[in-house]
Curated annotation (Swiss-Prot):
One of its GO terms (molecular function) is proton-transporting ATPase activity, rotational mechanism. Subunit of the peripheral V1 complex of vacuolar ATPase essential for assembly or catalytic function. V-ATPase is responsible for acidifying a variety of intracellular compartments in eukaryotic cells. The keyword Ion transport applies. Keywords: Hydrogen ion transport, Ion transport, Transport. InterPro entries: ATPase_V1-cplx_f_g_su, ATPase_V1-cplx_fsu_euk, ATPase_V1_fsu_sf. Belongs to the V-ATPase F subunit family. This is V-type proton ATPase subunit F. One of its GO terms (cellular component) is contractile vacuolar membrane. Gene3D superfamilies: ATPase, V1 complex, subunit F. It comes from Dictyostelium discoideum (Social amoeba). It comes from the Eukaryota. V-ATPase is a heteromultimeric enzyme composed of a peripheral catalytic V1 complex (components A to H) attached to an integral membrane V0 proton pore complex (components: a, c, c', c'' and d).
Amino acid sequence: MATKSLSETALVAVIGDEDVVTGFLLAGVGQKDKKKNENFLVVDSKTSQAKIETAFKSFTTRNDIAIIMITQKVADEIRYLIDEYHQVIPTILEIPSKDHPYDPKKDSVMLKVKKMTGSD
């Protein structure tokens, strides 16, 4: 597996509903690079799957992002992309949202860990 080098400052990217993204932005996570690319995407009922896919693909190829936080509800919409993603950096972390609790049985990272450790 090829390793990816990070730029000097590694960012956290966030994909989720307005409440989750706003919380991370208030904590100082939000950034815009020189090309005006943001490291977050607010997803609502009008956000197309294509827009979510584009943001995810963009975040996974950027050298300045080390972690992608994505609400599990949104992750379910692009589950096939997350399941196909095998790089260590950026790491994908599925998180709960206000209205949708976290289910470890759906989390790709948790499933990979269980498979590697042989636990159920």
